[in-house]
Design a protein with these regions (language model features):
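Local beta-strand N-terminus motif with an aromatic residue
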Residues: 1, 110-111, 140, 201
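Condensing-enzyme catalytic core mediating Claisen C-C bond formation in acyl metabolism
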Residues: 34-113
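Conserved phosphate-binding/catalytic loops in two-lobed NTP-binding clefts
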Residues: 138-151
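Short, active-site-adjacent cap segments at secondary-structure transitions
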Residues: 11-14, 121-123, 150-151
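Glycine-centered flexible beta-alpha turn that most often forms the glycine-rich phosphate-binding loop
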Residues: 117
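Conserved beta-strand-centric core segments of catalytic alpha/beta enzyme folds
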Residues: 1-64, 157-223
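Stable alpha-helical structural segments in soluble proteins, enriched in small hydrophobic residues
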Residues: 99-107, 131, 135, 161, ...
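Short glycine/threonine-rich loop-to-helix capping motif typified by GTGT followed
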Residues: 85-96, 120-136, 153-160, 193
Length: 223
């Protein structure tokens, strides 16, 4: 198969928001200042901010793309998926660890940057941080969560964050995690990027770790 159109879209609607609110998954402590509500890795994070949107990518066989003089933005160099089924909303972290390990193995090298799943939930952020520290020991790549700026667009977010990662490769920068006023203790052992930083990264991992233990990590590299 030469071309695959891949992506997702999500309409932010009260009917879906209310379900996540009933589960206690959404932030409520910053209702008076909603721009500060999505704060992955801050000690005062209290849930995610639901959003909407869409993202579409064209995955194309390299020689096919060259023949039609396509503008090749990046290469999909690694991928892995796991399903741990530990809990509906509280991840174990083990599935995330295996997922990142598998993606790195398929790529064959370490990465310069991770766009984390980082939704701003107390339990989810902690599990992902612990998995990253266990995987990379004392040599963590730069990490940040673009959800701190965009919110969590559910079914669209995996495609969107792959696009954001490609933009960072192309435009030579690392996006920040914003709203970190008091960084959580667990994040102090990783290279957490809190400002837009000029950096000519060559590879980026994008993590999507959903409710129910469905996990995917993909690695895009500069072309």
């Amino acid at each position: 198969q030469d071309i695959v159109i891949a992506g997702g879209g999500e309409d932010e609607h009260w009917s879906s928001s209310s379900l996540f609110d009933a589960m206690g998954a959404l932030s409520s402590n910053f209702n008076d200042d909603p721009k500060k509500a999505s704060r992955p890795y801050d000690k005062n994070r209290d849930g995610f901010v639901i959003s909407g949107g869409s993202g579409i990518l064209i995955l194309e066989e390299e020689e096919h793309a060259k023949k039609r003089n396509a503008n090749i933005l990046a290469k999909l160099s690694g991928y892995f998926a796991t399903s741990d089924g530990y809990d509906m909303v509280a991840p174990s972290g083990e599935g995330a660890l295996r997922c990142m390990q598998g993606a790195l193995k398929s790529y064959g090298s370490d990465v310069d940057y991770i766009n984390t799943h980082g939704t701003s939930t107390p339990v989810g952020d902690l599990a992902e941080l612990n998995a990253i520290k266990e995987l990379f020991i004392n040599n963590s790549p730069f990490i940040s969560s673009t959800k701190s700026m965009t919110g969590h667009s559910l079914g669209a977010t995996g495609a969107q964050e792959a696009i954001y990662s490609i933009m960072m490769l192309r435009d030579k920068f690392i996006a920040p995690s914003i709203n970190i006023e008091d960084v959580c203790d667990e994040a102090k052992g990783v290279k957490l990027n809190t400002e837009t930083t000029s950096s000519e990264i060559k590879s980026a991992m994008s993590n999507s770790f959903g409710f129910g233990g469905t996990n995917a990590s993909l690695i895009v590299t500069k072309y």
